[in-house]
Amino acid sequence: MDYLESLDFPKVVEIVKKYALSDLGRKHLDTLKPTVNPWDELELVEELLNYFARWGEPPIKGLNDISQEVERVKSGSALEPWELLRVSVFLEGCDILKKDFEKREYSRLKETFSRLSSFRDFVEEVNRCIEQDGEISDRASPRLREIRTEKKRLASEIKRKADDFVRTHSQILQEQMYVYRDGRYLFPVKASMRNAVRGIVHHLSSSGATVFLEPDEFVELNNRVRLLEEEERLEISRILRQLTNILLSRLNDLERNVELIARFDSLYARVKFAREFNGTVVKPSSRIRLVNARHPLIPKERVVPINLELPPNKRGFIITGPNMGGKTVTVKTVGLFTALMMSGFPLPCDEGTELKVFPKIMADIGEEQSIEQSLSTFSSHMKKIVEIVKNADSDSLVILDELGSGTDPVEGAALAVAIIEDLLEKGATIFVTTHLTPVKVFAMNHPLLLNASMEFDPETLSPTYRVLVGVPGGSHAFQIAEKLGLDKRIIENARSRLSREEMELEGLIRSLHEKISLLEEEKRKLQKEREEYMKLREKYEEDYKKLRRMKIEEFDKELRELNDYIRKVKKELDQAIHVAKTGSVDEMREAVKTIEKEKKDLEQKRIEEATEEEIKPGDHVKMEGGTSVGKVVEVKSGTALVDFGFLRLKVPVSKLKKAKKEEKEESSAVSYRPSSFRTEIDIRGMTVEEAEPVVKKFIDDLMMNGISKGYIIHGKGTGKLASGVWEILRKDKRVVSFRFGTPSEGGTGVTVVEVKV
């Protein structure tokens, strides 16, 4: 039985095929089926995803489907010029792709596509022999050049003679012209003047008034032209055969290249699918856990992500709830994602998703239409279930939709429980949907099973499509009836007809749903608080950036003034030295006076500074000419280490003065100093836009704390976030280098950045 079809596997493959470059990739995708060892395919997909994130699309020049051309080569046919051009472009593309992968750091891609064979000699020969429009070039062979040269010379001679003939025989011609038909030059002679010239009549006009005549003097020339044309055709055929034989002599290499490009195109399509659907590569694991799994056949704007986890000590889920509530989509997604992962496909879900390998995936998917189904429908489902039960074992994943429906509810429930028990005894992992109460009760009491339900909003009388784990689903019949206005007396009468056990179960389920609703409300409140916190954090970071820019501008001004003063003194010293070497005594005296004056000014400055209060650790100070207030950390050898909050500077004591009280207070109101600092940040879940200010602040903090290396955790996923982070780092001049982490550092889920300190 083709269980994959019931899980929508072929439909998803059709979606992926739309992203392939050619039929080669599309055919390869059709060959992908679940296997117990999908590691090779998954690792290649993951590496190509990372390639896209870092380098963009790989070079894909001319990677078209040349299967028909290869078959013609195998059959012994000589390829036509346009076919040889297609093969040449394809093989040139193979060479470009191989060289590109050789210089990248992706070992699996490099190893796999290193087997592409180079056909450089063939490509060069085709480029030499065939023009881009498909015409055979004169360069193809010396003989072809000779033939064409002779043809041109002969054509020139014939044209000259034809022009002379028209001029000298104008009286017998219907028109002053000649035509070229079937490889011969003919003249339109008046029928009445037919015998005025010796020659062969080839055509007669429809009116009979004109004959198209080949004069005897042109017959030999035309024959020579026809002979040259035949020689040209034979020479071209020889050249095409020679080029085709190069391919025939390396047929195995050619076929291997086609197979490898088919595989590459298939990988390319899967990666494009992953990027379009925000997918990720899920490797085989020992558990089943879906994190925001999105069924690819449901439109993006309507799909509700599925979150589901089967603990290691459990072997199955019993999912209950009203029809059309999403039960079927949930269990199909588990089976579909398992089959896709085992076939080497990325999955539209978030990181953290885990799936097991099952050598057997079996499913019976029903139609969520009505509780009342025909006997024939029940029989067809039971036929599939019989086959599943017969083949199930500990290597099996079994998906059963609406088990027990289509017959008497009591018998159907008993049959469903018995089938579930048998599958569990055989060691199978099961995902079952039902609306039968006895099956819910059975699941609640079985140590290997978990109940789950599809959330239902009684206010809107509609499902939310969210999975509630640990809570069996109710029918909501009474709630719906009451909401729609049915008399309460009738509803109470209906309730009274339920057994005590049924009423207790209904009450328990209702109580659990109420608790879940309260928890969901708390979750929403926490989410709201988190959003408010993020807004405050963004505002704080923006304020911090403004403050830092302001401080840096102040220091830039002070440094410029200091540099100007140094340049002025240096210039005066240079002038003094020059005067000493070349000037007169008067000029030297003047230069000495200038230097003496500068010396006195500096000495006076030191005296004034010395009279001020001594600067010591703990003092609040300002730089000379500046407004930024900092705190002295230590004083050593006439130099103070001053903490300005956002950075620390070593400043000569002579360049500092104590701050006034009001300046201290202002400083304490705006100064910033991180209380603690970690050398890593986690930006998983953020968009590139959200991550940019966080990454830039992280670089600020690294530099302020004198740390040269940091770690940015962005996860693997589609690679969009990693690509965005690398673009941010590439533009930041403070960054010395960056790279993906080693396996021990987190691999491609982490970027290691080094900054200037």
From Swiss-Prot:
Statement: the UniProt record of this protein carries the keyword Phosphoprotein: no
Superkingdom classification of source: Bacteria
Subunit structure of this chain's protein: Homodimer. Binds to stalled ribosomes, contacting rRNA.
Organism: Thermotoga sp. (strain RQ2)
InterPro entries for the chain: DNA_mismatch_repair_MutS_C, DNA_mismatch_repair_MutS_core, DNA_mismatch_repair_MutS_sf, MSSS, MutS, MutS2, P-loop_NTPase, Smr_dom
Annotated gene: mutS2
Known function: Endonuclease that is involved in the suppression of homologous recombination and thus may have a key role in the control of bacterial genetic diversity.
Domain Smr: 681-756
Name by which UniProt lists this protein: Endonuclease MutS2
